Structure formats: structure tokens, C-alpha cells
From Swiss-Prot:
Family of this protein: Belongs to the SLX4 family.
Domain of life: Eukaryota
Protein name in UniProt: Structure-specific endonuclease subunit SLX4 2
Keyword Nucleus appears in the UniProt entry: yes
Alphabetical GO biological process terms: DNA recombination; DNA repair; DNA replication
Residues that span the membrane, as ranges: none
Post-translational modification, as annotated: Phosphorylated in response to DNA damage.
One Pfam family it belongs to: Slx4
Subunit structure of this chain's protein: Forms a heterodimer with SLX1.
Bias (Basic and acidic residues): 1-14, 24-34
């Protein structure tokens, strides 16, 4: 090689090395700049770091364990040791508490537990006063335990006080009972303990002059002489310890009674100008014969005025003047007369006379005594007790049948109301001239008399007639027939098939459909007797029975003349307008009633069972069910064969096959179905009706769903 070639080669090498050095230098500078950027980012983020010198533990340096392979001639032993090293041991559950790990844990998982402690510290923070004795912040300190126990004790102080009060209330020691805090409790707790005089006075509100020996109550007088007639003792029972205004009034009333009895004998104490009680009889009692007492029981009632709503009149034979006595008895007085003759017989009902009065004022005037009392019942405005109301017999009610809803639907139109009566009072007085058999009292019933309502069964029929047929409201009270016009001059469209209401034409124009299409709706109600009513009986105008004298007339317009016939059954020939030049008699075809078919012979219950068996949509009314079944019968099978079908699938298959054939004949509907164009069920129904096939929408919907035909409601 020439020297020039060597120089050129050396220059090339120098250039290559320079470029390499320059690229390495640029890479070094880029790495340094990147490291500086990372350090700046770390320094900026270090301000957000949560540092805790107390609880933070230094992360130990991971130790690298190197295995030293030992040469061994025995290959089986070496393979066994290698297999043992690959077996992993199950890890134990480690605690998040550092103190627990130091005592019971190992040092192998120190790095993981340290990161867990750091996360818990940064997440939950630190509780003040809980770092004593180098414990974790998650442990509860002694101060916290003391505060919790103190709070629990303070919250239970109120409960303890309440518990003590309840125990004291139920226990009631004897020393507290002796202080007079509960006299009734004391008496029931210790029956042998006798109550003092002051306790008796405060309990019964007794006068101190009528109490002696702390346990016995008697009247003032010499008790040593049994033959001496002592004055009656007045006792007032009160349930309240504190004397109220009502008890003060009672004391005044008792004083008035004591003042009157000092001047008037005991027999005249309750005498009134109208009535004097009969001589009282008492059984033989030697100890009680000498004593005459009056017991007055009064309640704390503020008002003793008589109530005008409850008044009973007592009329005597001797004096017909009534005496008004309030039924709200507030004072009861019982008189025992020891001066009368002693009778060994059993006392009768009238041996003790009880008189009701609303005031303690007693008149001392005597009146003649009647021999026997009679019962008089006085009407009152106050309604009787609900217990005494007799339930009305539901059979004796008026029932109304409406063909629009169902022939079986009923509605009660009249209800009997019981009469309000006042209660009956039984009184009996002793009669010396009568025998013992006459004293027997026959019980009289206090039940109110209920007026029975005659049983009626009414039937209502709604008809649609031509507007040219003028009808007025008509009522026949004798035969219980009512005719009422509901609507007049209602325009309707000409139906293509059977109408729900019966139409009565009045001329050939209306029959042919060339006249006016407006109609009138009338309602006829008549009484149905038990002998001519059945559940399957159809209701129409021709079942209304009329009287010959009853007519409906209107001089201003053509009117139907109802009545003037010999029989009670209204025939279609009777429904004709007033003779006019323009009117035409009704054709003979209207007079003939159609013969009942096989479906018409079935009852509504049987037809409803057929609907349920074949899976058809249930409808209300027998006429509607017959119409649906006749449309299906005209479409697939005769009526007798249709009724013989006993399977739902068989009926549906027959209907679906017939529908397939009919739709294929009409190319327009068939092409729309083949092109998956959504069709409306109403359009399919109208197409079938144009061919005199009448099926319900639910049957068509079932056919479309089973055949995969797309339908729409738009």
C-alpha cells in the first residue's frame, strides 16, 4: 500500500471515532438531563409525603442468598434435595401491629409488613397520646380506655336512679307503709293491722260522730235498747281521698235528707204527688226488725239534669198523670219498713221498690196508691241500641236485572229501616187479692218491630228504536212497568252485522237503509215473577205485560200505542205508529222470532266453560258469547260439530287452516305478508268481514303470532 492510501485510511478511522465519541457524549448528556428532571420531580412531590419518625421503621436491605453447589457423586441424593427446595411452605396470617410481629412474627416478611404499616399510617393517621412504650397507633391507650369507661358510667347513672325508683315502688318497706303513704296497700299487705279512726275518716269521708271502736259504723243513739227505733244511718262511699266539690254537694244533699226524715216517717220519705210505694215486706230477722235504715249511693256527678232524649212514662190505674223519670239513674234509695207485717214467704219482685230520680229533693205529699202498674212504651228520638236491631231478610228485597251488564247481575233498590223505639220497662207490684200464680211476670220482648218489605224481582231492558218512532215516558204502577226514554235522535252508522241492541223498524225505508239513521234509546223495567223467571231467559220488549187501560199518546207526533190488548203479552204487532198517510205497516218478517240454534240452547255458564276450554277471551253477556261462537261456526264448522270439539289445539288448527286459505285467495294481503310488511289486525279483520267472515281480534292475534306474521298498532 502506498503512503497516500495509508493516510486516507487513517483519516477515515479518525472520523469514525470522532463521530462515535460525539454520539456517546450526547447520549450521556441526555441521560444526565433526564436524571436531573426526575430528581426535580421527586423533590417537588416530597412535600406531600407523610413522614413519621416515631412509627416509621427503616426498610431493611434485601439480602441476596446464593446457593453453593456441592459436587456429589450420588445423583439420587442431589435430585431429592432439589425437589425439597421447590416445595413452598404455607404462610401464616400476619398481624398489622408492629409490636405483635416483633413478639410472634419472623423477620422474613419485614419489608411487606413495613409497607403495610406505612399505608395504614398514611390512611388513618395517628391518635394523640397513644405512642407510649413504642406501641402502634392502632392500639388503644390507657387514657382512651379510662375515657370510655367513664362515659359508660355517666350514661348509666340515670338508668340506676330510675331502677332504684322502680324497686322502691314495688318493694314498699313496712316503715314507709306505717307513715301513711298507701293505706290500701297496707290493709292488703297485713290484714291483722287495724286502721285508725283518722284513716277510716279520710278513706270513707265519714262524719266523726258516726264512727266508734275504729272498725264499726252505726247510727247515733242508744245501742243498748234493741226495741228502740233508731234513726237511719246515712253512708256515703267515695273513691277519692281528697274531698272534691261533688262530695261537698253530696253532704248538702244528705243534710237535707236527714232534715226531712226527722219530720216525715220513713214510709213517706220517697212519696210523690203521683205515686206512693207499696208496703214493703222483709223476711223474718229478729236483729233487723227493730232497725230501720236508709242507704244512699251517689256518684260524683256534676250535672243531675234530666235528659230529654230518654224519657219513660209510668201510668198508674188510680192516677193517669204521667211522671217523667230520667233513665240516667244517679241516686238509688232503698226503704226497709219494719213496722209492716212479717211474711214468711219469699219476697216478690215488688217487695223492694227502686225509684229513679235525678235530684235528692223529695216531696212529702202522699198520693193514692195504685193496685197494679202497667207497662207503657213511649217513642223517643234517641235511636235504639245496635244490639236490638234485627237484620232484615235479604230475600225480601227488590232486585233489578240489567241486560247491558249481565243477566245475573242484581242491585238492591230498597232497604227496610227499623223503627226507633224506646226500651220497655217491666214493673210488677204485689197484690194481696191475687193468687200466687197471678204474680208470674210474662217476659216482654224489647226487640223493635221491623216492617217486612215485599219481595220484588225487576228486569230492565234497553232497546234501540228508530227516531221516527216517538215514545213518551210511561209508568204502570198496577203492573209495575216503567218505560223511560234515555236518548233521542242519536245518529249512528249503518251496521254491517248484528247489533248489540234490538232494532224495531217502523217503515220500509228504515228497513231498506234508505231513511234516516238516527235512533232513540228507551229503557223498560218490569216485574218478573218467580214462575216465569229463569237464568237463561232472554230479555226483550216482547216479554213486557201491559194492561188494556194504559196507553202512551202524543198528539204532536206519531206515537206508539201500548195497551188496549186482550192478552198480557206484548206482541210485535202492537208496536205500530199512529195511522198516517205516509206510514207503512211493519212487514211480516219482523213478527217472526228466529228459531233457537244449538248454541242458543246452552246456558251462559256452559258457554263460559266452552270459552275457557278453547282458550278464547272471556266476554260479558250470553248474547256476545253466542255472537262470537256463531262467527267461528260460520267460518269453519257447523254449530253441532263446533260444540263437539273438545280440544283447544284442534279448534285452533281448524281456524288457522281456514285463515291460510282465505289469505292466499286475496293476493294483496298475501303479498304484504310475504314481504314482511307489518299489517294491522283491524285491516285483516275488515278484509275478512268483507267476505262475511267474523272473527275476534284476539283470535287473529293468536294466528299472527303462531304463523310469524308481523303486526303493528300504528
Amino acid at each position: 500500500m502506498s503512503p497516500e492510501g495509508e493516510e486516507s485510511h487513517a483519516e477515515d478511522n479518525l472520523y469514525f471515532h470522532n463521530t462515535q465519541m460525539q454520539s456517546i457524549h450526547e447520549e450521556t448528556l441526555a441521560e444526565e438531563s433526564h436524571a436531573q428532571a426526575i430528581q426535580r420531580s421527586i423533590s417537588r412531590l416530597s412535600s406531600f409525603k407523610h413522614e413519621d419518625t416515631d412509627s416509621e421503621s427503616p426498610i431493611p436491605v434485601q439480602k441476596v442468598i446464593r446457593q453453593i453447589k456441592k459436587t456429589n457423586t450420588n445423583t439420587n441424593t442431589t435430585k431429592t434435595k432439589k425437589r425439597k427446595l421447590k416445595v413452598s411452605k404455607p404462610r401464616k396470617n400476619m398481624s398489622s401491629s408492629e409490636s405483635v410481629r416483633q413478639m410472634y412474627g419472623s423477620r422474613k416478611n419485614g419489608e411487606q409488613q413495613g409497607s403495610i404499616d406505612g399505608f395504614l399510617m398514611s390512611r388513618f393517621g395517628e391518635v394523640d397520646g397513644c405512642n407510649e412504650s413504642d406501641r402502634s397507633s392502632k392500639l388503644i391507650s390507657q387514657g382512651e380506655w379510662e375515657s370510655l369507661s367513664k362515659f359508660h358510667e355517666e350514661s348509666n347513672e340515670k338508668d340506676k336512679l330510675l331502677r332504684k325508683k322502680i324497686q322502691r315502688y314495688y318493694s314498699e318497706p313496712q316503715e314507709e307503709l306505717g307513715e301513711g303513704c298507701g293505706m290500701l296497700t297496707q290493709a292488703s299487705a297485713d290484714p291483722e293491722t287495724k286502721m285508725t279512726k283518722e284513716e277510716l275518716e279520710s278513706l270513707y269521708d265519714l262524719d266523726s260522730s258516726t264512727v266508734f271502736n275504729q272498725t264499726t259504723i252505726s247510727a247515733i243513739g242508744d245501742m243498748s235498747e234493741p226495741t228502740q227505733v233508731s234513726e237511719p244511718c246515712v253512708v256515703i262511699l267515695s273513691q277519692t281521698k281528697v274531698q272534691s266539690e261533688a262530695s261537698t254537694q253530696e253532704d248538702g244533699a244528705d243534710a237535707s235528707v236527714q232534715e226531712i226524715k226527722s219530720t216525715v216517717p220513713a214510709q213517706e220519705l220517697f212519696s210523690t204527688p203521683e205515686f206512693v210505694p207499696a208496703p214493703l215486706e222483709q223476711p223474718v230477722n229478729k236483729e233487723m226488725c227493730s232497725d230501720q235504715s236508709i242507704v244512699v249511693l251517689e256518684e260524683n256527678v256534676q250535672s243531675t239534669q234530666a235528659d230529654d232524649s230518654d224519657i219513660v212514662e209510668l201510668i198508674s190505674d188510680s192516677d193517669p198523670e204521667p211522671e217523667e223519670v230520667s233513665t240516667k239513674v244517679q241516686v238509688l234509695r232503698s226503704i226497709y219498713d219494719s213496722s209492716g207485717p212479717v211474711n214468711d214467704k219469699q219476697p216478690s219482685v215488688a217487695s223492694e221498690t227502686v225509684e229513679s230520680d235525678s235530684t235528692p229533693i223529695v216531696s212529702p205529699v202522699k198520693t193514692p196508691q195504685g193496685t197494679r202498674m202497667h207497662v207503657v212504651q213511649v217513642a223517643s228520638s234517641n235511636p235504639s241500641s245496635p244490639i236490638k236491631i234485627v237484620e232484615e231478610n235479604t230475600e225480601q228485597q227488590e232486585e233489578v236485572f240489567t241486560d247491558v251488564e249481565s243477566i245475573y247481575s242484581t242491585a238492591r233498590t230498597s232497604f227496610g229501616t227499623p223503627k226507633h223505639t224506646s226500651p220497655v220497662i217491666l214493673l210488677e207490684s204485689s197484690d194481696t187479692d191475687c193468687d200466687d200464680n197471678d204474680n208470674d211476670v210474662e217476659p216482654l220482648s224489647s226487640m223493635p218491630m221491623v216492617k217486612t218489605v215485599p219481595k220484588k224481582r225487576m228486569r230492565t231492558t234497553v232497546l234501540q228504536v228508530s227516531a221516527a218512532l216517538k215514545v213518551q215516558n210511561y209508568t204502570d204502577e198496577k203492573n209495575n212497568i216503567k218505560l223511560r226514554k234515555i236518548g233521542d235522535d242519536i245518529p249512528v252508522e249503518v251496521p254491517t252485522k248484528d247489533v248489540e241492541y234490538e232494532e224495531i223498524p217502523d217503515s220500509q225505508e228504515s228497513v231498506g237503509g234508505e231513511g234516516d239513521n238516527s235512533v232513540s234509546i228507551i229503557e223498560i223495567t218490569r216485574e218478573v215473577h218467580n214462575n216465569d223467571y229463569t237464568g237463561d231467559e232472554s230479555t226483550d220488549l216482547f216479554q213486557v205485560g201491559l194492561n188494556k187501560q194504559d196507553t202512551c199518546e202524543d198528539t204532536s207526533s206519531p206515537v206508539v200505542q201500548i195497551g188496549g190488548v186482550e192478552n198480557d203479552i206484548l206482541d210485535s204487532s202492537l208496536i205500530e205508529p199512529v195511522p198516517e198517510p205516509e206510514s207503512v205497516p211493519v212487514p211480516e218478517e219482523v213478527q217472526e222470532q228466529p228459531q233457537p240454534t244449538a248454541i242458543d240452547k246452552h246456558t251462559a255458564t256452559q258457554l263460559r266453560e266452552k270459552f275457557q276450554l278453547w282458550g278464547l277471551k272471556p266476554v260479558r253477556g250470553k248474547e256476545k258469547m253466542v255472537e262470537i261462537l256463531q262467527g267461528i261456526s260460520n267460518f269453519i264448522l257447523p254449530e253441532h260439530e263446533l260444540l263437539a270439539v273438545a280440544d283447544k289445539q284442534e279448534l285452533q288448527s281448524c281456524i288457522f287452516r281456514k285463515l291460510d286459505a282465505v289469505i292466499r285467495e286475496g293476493r294483496a294481503m298475501y303479498d304484504r305478508i310475504l314481504s314482511f310488511e307489518p299489517i294491522r289486525l283491524e285491516e285483516l279483520q275488515s278484509m275478512l268481514q268483507s267476505q262475511d267472515h267474523y272473527l275476534e281480534l284476539d283470535v287473529l292475534r293468536l294466528y299472527c303470532d303462531s304463523s310469524g306474521i308481523t303486526t303493528t298498532n300504528a
